[in-house]
Amino acid sequence: MLLSLYLKQHGILEKDIKHIAFRSENNTFNLQVNNQNFEDPRIQDRYTMAFLSSLTYTENCYSCKYAQKKRISDITIGDAWGSDLADEEIKNGNFFNSLSKQKKGIQLVNNLPFHVESVDLDKTVSHNHQLCYPSQAPEMRDFFFDEIKKEKEFDLLVAKIYPKVCIKQDIKKIMKKFKLY
């Protein structure tokens, strides 16, 4: 619902979408529609900003019983944020995290056709709170959804909730327009 609304407010209809991704080719978070970056990869679009700040999560994300260090699945795959691996390698998408204490999961990881390296679990967990506890709903979440129901503009609502971050991104857009960024 939210993505459709966001895209519609930017003149993109769902029926015209053949491909959608939330990471650009340099592995930064950035909305892509039909293999085109929605925004310059150095500039964060409002949809991605709202998602990464936990504003647009579903209600169950704020009370997820699986958001803890103790894993119940055979394997958990995620980003390698906070690990000892080179930032450039992580940025290029050459690394991901897999957590597993289960025999099946360990076998699966060991049989992957890539180089596998152990990292400090505590460091990685400290950079990805979902591995410790559920996301916390932002203070303005209810306001955001109340206004969305009234068909208010997505971008303006995000700017109202996160003015400093949005101003910074808007300055980048202006600088890019004048070839200063």
Tell where the protein language model's regions lie, with residue ranges.
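Long, compositionally biased charged/polar accessory segments in the mid-to-C-terminal portions
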Residues: 15-181
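Contiguous mid-protein beta-loop-alpha structural module that forms a pocket-lining wall or clamp
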Residues: 1-16, 20
